[in-house]
Amino acid sequence: MHIIKRNGEPQPYMREKIIVAISAAFRSVQNPLAPEVPAIITDLAAEVERQLFEMNRAGVPVHVEKIQDFVEKTLTKYNHSDEVKSFILYRDDRTKKRIAREQIACCFTDSSVLGVLKEIQQDFPFPEYSLDALASKFLLFKKEVTDERRSMQLLIKAAVELTAQEAPQWELIAARLLMLDFSLALGTSLEKLNIHSFYEKITYLEEAGLYGVYIRTHYSRAEIEEAATYLECSRDKLFTYSSLDMILRRYVIRTRAHVPLETPQEMFLGIALHLAMNETQDRMQWVKRFYTVLSKLQVTVATPTLSNARKPFHQLSSCFVDTVPDSLDGIYRSIDNFSQVSKFGGGMGLYFGKVRAVGAPIRGFQGAAGGILRWIKLANDTAVAVDQLGVRQGSVAVYLDVWHKDIPEFLQLRTNNGDDRMKAHDVFPAVCYPDLFWKTVRDNLGASWYLMCPHEILTVKGYALEDFYAEEWEKRYWDCVKDARISKRTIPIKELVRLVLKSVVETGTPFAFYRDHANRANPNGHRGIIYCSNLCTEIAQNMSAINLVSVKITEVDGQKVVVQTTRPGDFVVCNLASLVLSNIDLSDDKELREVVRVAVRALDNVIDLTYYPVPYAQVTNAYYRAIGLGVSGYHHVLAQQGIDWESDEHLAFADRIFERINRAAIEASMTIAREKGAYGCFTGSDWCTGAYFRKRGYVSEDWQRLQREVATHGMRNGYLLAVAPTSSTSIIAGTTAGVDPIMKQYFLEEKKGMLMPRVAPSLSQKTCPLYKSAHAVEQRWSIRAAGLRQRHIDQAQSVNLYITTDFTLKQVLDLYVYAWEVGMKSLYYVRSQSLEIDLCGYCAS
């Protein structure tokens, strides 16, 4: 027997559907069902079925509405009055939903529209997500529009504009509609190109120069076709409108005519194929694991990895840090390095602390040096000029020590007044502070501070002051102060603090780097020193300048060539990814450890697979094998777990979860070392000697066991954890950025000609009180939490401070001192409510 659907199509009769409908009527009255009810339901279904078969034998077509009439009459006949009322209401509700669906679907010829609308009604059954509201707004927008593509865009716009604090899930509904629109357009494009499989798509993209040839070189057709079976299109439902919109606009592969040819899930799979490419054992299993954590939004990779993995130019690393030497060729080499890094989408940190100050001698000529500002302006102009094919200008943070003679002028680089010839508005200044500075500020604000030229110290004393830290640095600093041969620029420390705070309030910068904290905790202090951090202040790794060894003229193939030989120094590279805490079951230690294990493995593979814009980066990366695993969704997970930001419970959570993440990351790196070998300078490191564990007070039996295993097997990665800001990728994951509190629970952003609502993730009556905005949060709670996290993070964190217009300069200063007291290694922006700040996309892992 066949049943006639409402659209006139026949479908096979299924008794189970009748049982489901009757069961729903009974459950609406009594839930759970009484023991005797299932038998009653079976008998009622049999009675309905008997009437249907009689009708069918008589040659009368059986329509779906007739079945519902029979159910209603049968319930009435056997005196199930409450159930009848429920069933009538159910039918009425279904009718209303069907009418709302059809009001929208009739505007489109593709039948998949109706299917998506049905799915939306099933997944969002609450009244505030009724399709009646969507239909009303859509039809109001549509009016005389007949073009189906334009109509679909208006339907999406209607869903987006229905998003509100009281109905935040309209953003998920809008994403479903956006995915439908994208899929329909993509299907048409693929049909024209005669592409019917993932393998055919990769082949076409490769031949078009849009996909790396290395994928098909490393994988057989059978392996790529197996990988295609891993695709889980249902995971597209995890996207919000904002996240899907960003992926489709920025990250899926498009033709040179800007036609998209890749789905979000294929993007994740392509990245997984790239990152697993060099695996020699269980390679396809690693492809699946990488794809799983990416597609389930449990891990986000850095923006360059998301953009460039699987493509011909596969620069996968986020940020680079260079030590600028005190020589003409060295300075220009650093500027050239920055231009190459920027060309391929990386951000840069430049340490200028070795460059001589204004008035220093050059080749014995007194007063000849022009100081660091003219070189910083060169970096500024390079950032503007090398703009990544017009996509965005380069970004560079410039670091200087607080005792450098040029620091007062440096602190005015971006302020609004003063000589514009001394400004560099397109760089991000940052200051490196020793402990002595903050001790003096805290204990004796009336004291003097002595500024000196690093070149002069090197000439007179025979050592570079910046090459020391903590007590040894302090001893040598006072030795230099007392040495009459070294000229000093004396400034009241109060005046220097005033210049810092004035710039911070006006521009949000300079960033702060607490160099003594960073170097005390450096697990590779036996091989060098950390002068500064990177563009987003989360990286803390050994640094040293590139040095020219020789220049020789020789002959190759009968022609004269000039050969330069350089020592590569320690040119820092940041390979970043983030755990999305809100998308991981943190109560399940096995799940957390598995996700961390997969993320660490993927990051370790990035080191061998990335394209290096400069060779010095490749040497350093291969030697230290440094990675930076961080987190996003921090405020989101606090809200999910019912934890107030301003509470001791938050502090306990921060300490506990980061210890677990750290242990899992160390275990993962140690496991890879056992398989592939330890990083180049493991021997003698804090990892090797056990000092890493002792410094952090890791004394439990589990930690002692892990310490012994690390000593035996080594560590694959010299640096492990670093918390990036994740400003872009947190949007993709539908969560909060980094470890910062949210800016607002809800706000409107104008984009593409419409108002885009931005809603705090998982916003509900329960989470609403827990989403206190960043500027309303007592900042000391944020700093205390950061201090507790820092114990478990071998590198640093991108932590912003948020101030209101009510803050005094003294209150801002107190926050800086407090951050130093709790052991933080860096501070990123100070974000005032009256200040617009450009967010960095480079470390958006």
UniProtKB/Swiss-Prot annotation:
Location of the ATP-cone domain: 1-98
Biological processes per GO annotation: deoxyribonucleotide biosynthetic process
Keywords: Allosteric enzyme, ATP-binding, Deoxyribonucleotide synthesis, Disulfide bond, Nucleotide-binding, Oxidoreductase
Residues binding substrate: T303, S318, C319, G347, N534, L535, C536, T537, E538, P725, T726, S727, S728, T729
Annotated site residues (Allosteric effector binding) in this chain: D326, R356
GO-annotated cellular components: ribonucleoside-diphosphate reductase complex
Substrates-to-products reaction catalysed: a 2'-deoxyribonucleoside 5'-diphosphate + [thioredoxin]-disulfide + H2O = a ribonucleoside 5'-diphosphate + [thioredoxin]-dithiol
Known regulation of activity: Under complex allosteric control mediated by deoxynucleoside triphosphates and ATP binding. The type of nucleotide bound at the specificity site determines substrate preference. It seems probable that ATP makes the enzyme reduce CDP and UDP, dGTP favors ADP reduction and dTTP favors GDP reduction.
CDD domains linked to this entry: RNR_I
Molecular function in Gene Ontology: ATP binding; ribonucleoside-diphosphate reductase activity, thioredoxin disulfide as acceptor
Superkingdom to which the source organism belongs: Bacteria
Function: Provides the precursors necessary for DNA synthesis. Catalyzes the biosynthesis of deoxyribonucleotides from the corresponding ribonucleotides.
Assembly description: Tetramer of two alpha and two beta subunits.
Annotated family: Belongs to the ribonucleoside diphosphate reductase large chain family.
UniProt protein name: Ribonucleoside-diphosphate reductase subunit alpha
Name of the gene encoding the protein in the UniProt record: nrdA
